[in-house]
Amino acid sequence: MNNFLRLIGRRLVALPIMALGVTVLVFFLMSFSKTDPAYTALGDGASPEAVAEYHEKYGLDDPWPVRYVRYMGNLIHGDMGTYGAARNSVAKRISTALPVTMQLTFIGLAIGAVVSFLLGVIAALYRDKWPDQVIRVFSIAGLATPSCWLAVLLILLFSSYLKVLPASGALPHFTTNPAGYLGRMIMPAIALAFPLTGQMTRIVRTAMVEELDKDYVRMARGAGVPEKVVVGINVLRNALITPVTTLGLKIGYLMGGAVVIEVIFNLPGMGTAILQGVQGNEANLVQGVVIVVALAFIIINIVVDMLYLLINPRIRTV
């Protein structure tokens, strides 16, 4: 138990250190941008006097460590700066975009988890038989299929040809229009989940096969314990530790994929926000989106790591 608490403590201590490192790195790299925020906000025709006044007002001529400390002070209070001629709030833009990205990520994760666990268990139970062979082909296809390419195929099939699902348009709120919400999110989620499903199916199958070949399983079967009890209680519980951990670590990968998929399907998430920032030379918006995505990735992975410590009895009982 003491070992468990010590491991948890290490991860909690690592969180603020990693978060600080991310903000330093992103801010430092963005300081090399040749885009002048003054011209972005005031327009290309701004006079030198107006540009100088803008620089003076926002401290753009200060050394980057000074600007970083000021930025962090504002960030702690929820102020990530502004973007555009209208001085829109970066924090407000991210607050509307981040939930969309997280929803797409976890819908894709749920689809990938359910399908891969079912297929992996079936493939292991029917090892080297036709269900196993079919599932192996499916998993290879998933590994070989890029999400972007699958997204285009889904749009061509379900939006252009069958005309049953929308490929763009507003994203309805789930509570007011659940059918419209699911219809808008299902294709992006499938495109995001398919490669993950292929990989996780192989991992689940391998873990199940290794567990089924262990001596305690043979002894339980020899003692007359029903197969459902052996597989459902003992084998699954032990075999799924590694797949669950791997699945958790894939959340960051899915977030990165979701950012790209959102652009293809024109979803109002972080991908669209960062594209808007790049196209408009909005350094504050790009910087804010990158920092938030990186921090979300770090937090999720540390939480998953802590959950792994909880579900792994060998660590929990030390």
What are these regions (language model features)?
Residues 2-7, 98-131, 147, 176-318:
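Alpha-helical transmembrane segments of integral membrane proteins
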Residues 15, 45, 113, 140, ...:
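Residue-level recognition of pore/gate-forming positions within transmembrane alpha-helices
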Residues 33, 142-145, 255:
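Transmembrane helix irregularities
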Residues 18-69, 83, 162-184:
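Hydrophobic alpha-helical transmembrane segments of membrane transport/permease proteins
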Residues 87, 137-202:
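Membrane-water interface segments at transmembrane-helix boundaries in multipass membrane proteins
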